[in-house]
């Protein structure tokens, strides 16, 4: 009998950016449609056996407030017997939901759960609806912006504007090529708007123009290196993964997509938050007895 946590399936909505028809749609509705889509493509799972639903959210306010994971679960048709929670670790929130559900499975607390995330950067203002800063923390630059943090990291590691722009250009090229080749189709749950419009493609990736990228002004410092072309866009969307124990999957005829071999978290100086994945990755590799050379694909949230 194995309590090892396994991934059965994972899906997401299209990611909406500026100009997307998804803007204005309630994020709990988006998350509900995503979870419902996940369940519909895993018909062998009895939804009455789902024990917990965990969604990560950086700003659980407004439509993403009021325990959005519970609301999304109800909209998806999950029975009221399933619990729900919302986790905030900013950009790592959804990943932390995966940590929580898989840890609960391995501890024997539950056998099946859903982990994911939801965010609406258009309805929720930067900093939230009512930011309230602690002066003692403000004096230590605790509330540093993502843009300024990126500038500090670029300074520390001598990452030039040219290197950032080349990476951004390559990233958009790859994303557009993958989208056109249908590489994302299997992971996207089409979202239906109130007027019946169906959205099934990301709006963020675009055919990049090197000259336009070079012409942009720095976004966060007058003499900075980070521009709109090398920054993350405002986004709206949701994701969900079906996680079970290995024993549960085998017992119920669920195809295992991946085994969760290990987890780790690590802290760094808050002004250098962008470097956090480095010590966390080192810890995860050490705990699992792997080296970076054993890894074929890396993804950072």
Regions found by a protein language model. Give the residues of each.
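Conserved active-site "lid/cap" helical segment
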Residues: 1-58, 62-72, 76, 83, ...
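Flexible glycine-/small-residue-enriched beta->alpha junction loops
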Residues: 106-157
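Conserved N-terminal phosphate-binding loop of PLP-dependent enzymes in the Aspartate aminotransferase
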Residues: 119, 125-128, 147-152, 254, ...
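Conserved catalytic cysteine-centered active-site region
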Residues: 25, 57-110, 141-148, 207-233
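Active-site-proximal alpha-helical scaffold in enzymes
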Residues: 73, 87-118, 154-184, 240-247
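N-terminal extracellular/periplasmic Venus flytrap/periplasmic-binding protein-like
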Residues: 12-13, 24-33, 44, 163-251, ...
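Cysteine-centered functional microenvironments
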Residues: 16, 54-56, 82-96, 153-161, ...
């Amino acid at each position: 009998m194995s309590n090892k946590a396994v991934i059965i399936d994972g899906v997401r909505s299209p990611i909406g950016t500026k100009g997307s028809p998804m803007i204005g749609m309630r994020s709990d509705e988006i998350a509900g449609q995503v979870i419902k889509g996940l369940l519909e493509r895993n018909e062998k799972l009895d939804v009455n056996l789902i024990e917990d639903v965990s969604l990560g959210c950086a700003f659980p306010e407004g439509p993403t407030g009021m325990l959005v994971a519970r609301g999304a679960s109800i909209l998806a048709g999950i029975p009221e017997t399933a619990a729900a929670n919302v986790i905030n670790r900013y950009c790592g929130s959804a990943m932390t939901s995966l940590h929580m559900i898989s840890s609960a499975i391995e501890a024997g607390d539950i056998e099946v759960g859903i982990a994911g995330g939801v965010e609406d950067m258009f309805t929720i203002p930067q900093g939230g609806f009512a930011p309230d800063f602690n002066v003692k923390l403000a004096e230590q630059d605790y509330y540093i912006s993502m843009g300024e943090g990126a500038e500090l990291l670029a300074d520390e590691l001598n990452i030039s504007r040219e290197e950032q722009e080349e990476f951004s250009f390559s990233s958009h090229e790859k994303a557009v090529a993958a989208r056109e080749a249908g590489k994302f189709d299997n992971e996207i749950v089409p979202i239906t708007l109130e007027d019946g419009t169906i959205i099934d493609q990301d709006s963020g990736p675009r055919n990049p123009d090197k000259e336009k990228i070079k012409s942009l002004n720095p976004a966060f410092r007058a003499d900075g290196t980070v521009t709109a072309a090398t920054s993350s866009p405002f986004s709206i969307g949701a994701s969900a993964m079906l996680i079970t124990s290995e024993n549960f999957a085998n017992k119920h005829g669920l195809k295992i997509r991946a085994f969760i071999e290990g987890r780790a978290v690590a802290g760094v100086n808050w002004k250098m938050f962008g470097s956090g994945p480095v010590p966390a990755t080192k810890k995860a590799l050490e705990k699992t007895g792997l080296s970076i050379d054993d890894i074929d694909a890396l993804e950072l949230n």
